[in-house]
Design a protein with these regions (language model features):
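ATP/NTP phosphate-donor binding region
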Residues: 1-92, 347
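Fold-independent oxyanion-binding glycine-rich loops
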Residues: 10, 16-17, 39-40, 69, ...
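Short Gly/Thr/Asp-enriched flexible loops that form oxyanion-binding sites at enzyme active sites
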Residues: 51-52, 82, 101-115, 148-149
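Glycine/serine-rich anion-binding loops at beta->alpha junctions
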Residues: 90-106, 140-146, 279-282
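A glycine/threonine-rich phosphate-anchoring loop and its flanking beta-alpha core
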Residues: 114-211, 309
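Active-site segments that bind and position negatively charged phosphate/pyrophosphate groups
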Residues: 204, 208-333
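C-terminal charged capping/lid subdomain of soluble metabolic enzymes
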Residues: 307, 314-393
């Protein structure tokens, strides 16, 4: 087991009715002037936005609102939020939504804390943040794990770049997690969320370093739990217990727990998907599902023991005559699972058809974003990235 630092400062209020605690928790963490950031009209129609505002009003906390966050959140909305927050003396950012809203909130918090700099410089790798305004969330979509993570991803539509920035400064102060708020999600969004949750753990699982018996057991248990409940929700979308299991898994999958003792993870499936999201605006979890089988078949021989372990302990594969046979059976079983929950496993099923030139462009951009090469299961260079994209055709 490699050495690690595990830091998870987010206070979680989980369960039915927890939304009503937002004012109490905001006071506890010193928020006095709050930007409520949200996405589309679902937050309004569901009543959750009114519940949040009522709780803040009862706690005597000033608030201003900014909606309009879209999936693969845009840099332009972040800049709008920074200016609105400055004009209103905002000292705390509250996201009401899923990962896209929380990520947009984190980016606003970075920009607000260092107004002399362009916030995109963080995502472009040009500098590191020195400060960040406090952030919290009322979670309405279980997927990204941003409610407890140090990560946020923003899309620059001018350059068609989707980039991540990770820093503990942006870990939320608290997270309100009521599974009932996810009941009205469309099935596709629910299942894409489950794919995203699983991938956050799988990125940390498929590594070539560290001996992590306990961490592996936690990761495998989380993956089996999400798979089971994803199938439950596919046929019974209002099942509270299944919603609760998936929501809690969302947080544990991306707060660092399932990577303790490893080298930090592989992260190439995410980076490959980021290019697809930047160019084609695909749903993130669905894009990850589409990428993973091709990536896995490209790298598995270089990380064979982990793929065998995954096949047996997570996918329930009976060991074959050879380790390679077992690993490939595990990958095939994963594809079958994705299909059972309505997730794509290639470009066609994802609904995009990139040209050879676009795949080459995505590979070049991906290589630039990761400094030329990246990966733990197998270190990938630009030519490898392009080869994987071609496998998705």
């Amino acid at each position: 087991m490699l050495g690690f630092t595990y830091y998870t400062p987010t206070k979680v209020a989980f369960g039915k009715g927890s939304v009503e605690r937002v004012g109490e928790l905001m006071n506890q963490f010193g928020g006095t002037r709050v930007l409520i950031h949200y996405g589309g009209q679902s937050a309004v129609r569901s009543g959750v936005l009114d519940r949040v505002k009522k709780s803040l009003d009862e706690a005597g906390i000033f608030h201003v609102e900014l909606g309009g966050v879209v999936p693969n959140p845009h840099l332009a909305k972040v800049r709008e939020g920074i200016e609105l927050s400055k004009a209103n003396g905002v000292d705390f950012l509250l996201a009401v939504g899923g990962g896209s809203v929380i990520d947009s909130c984190k980016a606003i918090a970075y920009g607000l804390a260092e107004p002399e700099h362009d916030v995109w410089e963080l995502y472009a790798g040009q500098r590191k943040a020195k400060a960040c305004f406090p952030v919290a969330s009322v979670l309405t979509i279980a997927a990204a794990g941003s409610e407890m993570s140090n990560s946020c991803v923003i899309t620059n539509t001018d350059t068609e770049e989707k980039r991540a920035y990770n820093d503990d400064l942006a870990r939320p102060k608290f997270a309100i997690m009521d599974p009932e708020l996810t009941m009205t999600l469309p099935d596709y969004q629910t299942e894409a969320g489950c794919a995203d949750i699983m991938m956050h753990t799988m990125e940390r699982y498929f590594v070539n370093s560290g001996t992590m018996e306990l961490t592996d057991a936690l990761a495998e248990g989380l993956l089996r739990t999400v798979m089971h409940n994803a199938e439950v929700l596919h046929t019974d979308p209002r099942n509270y217990d299944a919603r609760a299991e998936v929501m809690w898994a969302s947080s544990l999958a991306h707060n660092g727990l399932t990577g303790c003792g490893s080298d930090g993870g592989d992260w190439m499936p995410h980076l490959l998907e980021h290019e697809m999201g930047g160019m084609f605006n695909v749903t993130h979890g669905a894009g990850l599902a589409a990428v993973w089988p091709s990536w896995a078949r490209y790298v598995y021989k270089d990380c064979l023991p982990r793929f065998v372990k995954y096949a047996v302990n997570v996918m329930g594969v009976t060991p074959g005559a050879t380790d390679e046979e077992t690993a490939l059976a595990g990958i095939a079983a994963m594809e079958e699972f994705y299909h059972r929950i309505g997730m794509p496993v290639n470009f066609k099923e994802l609904g995009i058809d990139p040209t050879d030139e676009q795949m080459a462009e995505m590979a070049a951009s991906c290589a630039r974003a990761c400094g030329g090469a990246k990966g733990s299961a197998k270190v990938l260079h630009q030519s490898d990235m392009e080869a994987i994209y071609k496998m998705l055709k």
